[in-house]
Amino acid sequence: MDLGKVITAMVTPIHPEKNKVCKKRIHHLVNHLIDNGSDGLVIAGTTGESPTLSHDEKMKLFRQVVETNAGRAKLIAGTGSNNTAETIAFTKEVAELGGIDAVLVVAPYYNKPNQDGLYAHFVAVAEASDLPVVIYNIPGRSVVNIEPETIIRLAKLPNIIGVKESSGNLDNISKIIAETSDDFLVYSGDDSLTLPILAVGGNGVISVASHVVGNEMQEMMQAYESGDVKKAASIHRSLLPLMNGLFSVPNPAPTKYLLNQQGISVGPVRLPLVDLNAEQGTKLQAILEGLSK
């Protein structure tokens, strides 16, 4: 299955006065992302502030993105949680919606399952629905790391098609790529590791930076794929300050700040996250402006 090279982990537009998921702003953002380099979108993931979205808000978000997308980009819905039964029920509900190409299922957080528990969790979710499953390994947030051996075992299941790897461990990522089939998708979950992961055989990136430099991310991908590694490396180096700047305070506050500054109204972040202060915003804007110099 081809989900594309640059997949944007989409922020969730919130109405600034009503503090509600905003249909009009969703429509505008989806069109902006597709028109500016995104092959696919992850909806209601970490960058989409999934912990502070209600179930009903997530379903509203999915419906509106599906409607606006109209089949143009691949859509991946975040349905994971630390409750296996809840994840299964939510994934089934999303499957009935139509228009969703795959689900992103995060490693169960807080309850700290061992590798056997992680394996059983993903097997149960994958077997409960026909929607393809992308594993999300992010030990920095979930506390548990899905070991390469566990991912390699899971990759043998027909409905588990890939992994978003945010462990930052290139040795582990290389092992996964080497010991899974060619059609198992391995995506960088960190913008700054996109090029290194491509170099060891990865498929692309689930990106935050592509909200504002999606075309540049595509250019880097295309340069690498065409064999112009020097050009790809040059683009990577030029984008690195922005990639790091977007995580200077908790994500997605910096991304929302830049989008709002560019006229793509996505509103504020929800508590317990807070928006950038004036000093933080000025520094981030200077980084973005420095890319064109």
Swiss-Prot record:
This is 4-hydroxy-tetrahydrodipicolinate synthase. InterPro entries: Aldolase_TIM, DapA, DapA-like, Schiff_base-form_aldolases_AS, Schiff_base-form_aldolases_CS. Pyruvate binds at T47, I206. It comes from Listeria innocua serovar 6a (strain ATCC BAA-680 / CLIP 11262). Its EC number is 4.3.3.7. Belongs to the DapA family. The record marks T46, Y110 as: Part of a proton relay during catalysis. One of its GO terms (molecular function) is 4-hydroxy-tetrahydrodipicolinate synthase activity. Catalyzes the condensation of (S)-aspartate-beta-semialdehyde [(S)-ASA] and pyruvate to 4-hydroxy-tetrahydrodipicolinate (HTPA). One of its GO terms (cellular component) is cytosol. The lineage of its organism: Bacteria, Bacillati, Bacillota, Bacilli, Bacillales. Homotetramer; dimer of dimers. Pathway: Amino-acid biosynthesis; L-lysine biosynthesis via DAP pathway; (S)-tetrahydrodipicolinate from L-aspartate: step 3/4.
